[in-house]
């Protein structure tokens, strides 16, 4: 029995010795690792000082102050990017809406002048286009159209509404022979016009006259 137990004791002793050596190596390496870590931190702080030099950093600043300035600069940059992204999205939405309105105006002109199209079909088509109008949350057709006109060269925004009333109010007099062809939609029977929302063809025909002229000077995104 004694010979068989001797190798097991030797193995156990060797394992204990290896563990102590590994623990000793870790203790010996710990100061070196800590020194390298601090060197990396100081090097990064010095790079931050150089990046911030000439703006807010004075001759000498504590490390905490350098970090605070860096955080403020990064936050400002992120806020600026967010504002730019929101502005680009708003401009893209306005261009899309302006193109949609322009297309709806052209459809309105066509169905108003084409004698082969039934008045009921024309009213249903325009009603569908108005219901499908891309609107921002909380906005209305008047707001969208006013923003589109205001963004155009020479556009007058809400000043393009018919005088003497709100955009929903009907025209004060029937269109004459020399008026815009888009106003021919008013010849549709009143029973059919009632199917169109209050923000209906009257608003399209009266408010988009200036949009048609201004669109020649500015390209519009077309939804087709």
Curated annotation (Swiss-Prot):
Query: What's said on domains?
Result: The C-terminal WRPW motif is a transcriptional repression domain necessary for the interaction with Groucho/TLE family members, transcriptional corepressors recruited to specific target DNA by Hairy-related proteins. Has a particular type of basic domain (presence of a helix-interrupting proline) that binds to the N-box (CACNAG), rather than the canonical E-box (CANNTG).
Region annotated Disordered sits at 1-31, 146-209
The biased composition feature labelled Acidic residues covers: 181-190
Q: Name one GO cellular component term.
A: transcription regulator complex
- Keyword Repressor in annotation: yes
Entry protein name: Transcription cofactor HES-6
Ranges where the bHLH domain occurs: 25-77
A biological-process GO annotation: regulation of transcription by RNA polymerase II
Where is this chain primarily localised? nucleus
Identify the keywords attached in UniProt to this record, alphabetized. Developmental protein, Differentiation, Nucleus, Repressor, Transcription, Transcription regulation
Quaternary structure note: Transcription repression requires formation of a complex with a corepressor protein of the Groucho/TLE family. Interacts with HES1.
Q: Which organism is it from?
A: Mus musculus
């Amino acid at each position: 029995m004694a010979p068989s137990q001797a190798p097991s004791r030797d193995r156990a002793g060797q394992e204990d010795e290896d563990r102590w050596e590994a623990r000793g190596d870790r203790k010996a390496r710990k100061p070196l690792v800590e020194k390298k870590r601090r060197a990396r931190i100081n090097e990064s702080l010095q790079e931050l000082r150089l990046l911030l030099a000439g703006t807010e950093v004075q001759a000498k600043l504590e490390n905490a102050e350098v970090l605070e300035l860096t955080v403020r600069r990064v936050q400002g940059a992120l806020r600026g990017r967010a504002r730019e992204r929101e502005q680009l999205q708003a401009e893209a939405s306005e261009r899309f809406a302006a193109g949609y309105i322009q297309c709806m105006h052209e459809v309105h002109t066509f169905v108003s002048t084409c004698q082969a199209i039934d008045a009921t079909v024309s009213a249903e088509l325009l009603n569908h286009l108005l219901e499908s109008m891309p609107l921002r949350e909380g906005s209305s057709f008047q707001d969208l159209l006013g923003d589109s006109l205001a963004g155009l060269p020479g556009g007058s925004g809400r000043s393009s509404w018919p005088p003497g009333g709100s955009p929903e109010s009907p025209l004060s007099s029937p269109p004459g022979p020399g008026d815009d062809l888009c106003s021919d939609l008013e010849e549709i029977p009143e029973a059919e016009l009632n199917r169109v929302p209050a923000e209906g063809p009257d608003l399209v025909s009266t408010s988009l006259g200036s949009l048609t002229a201004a669109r020649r000077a500015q390209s519009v995104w077309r939804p087709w």
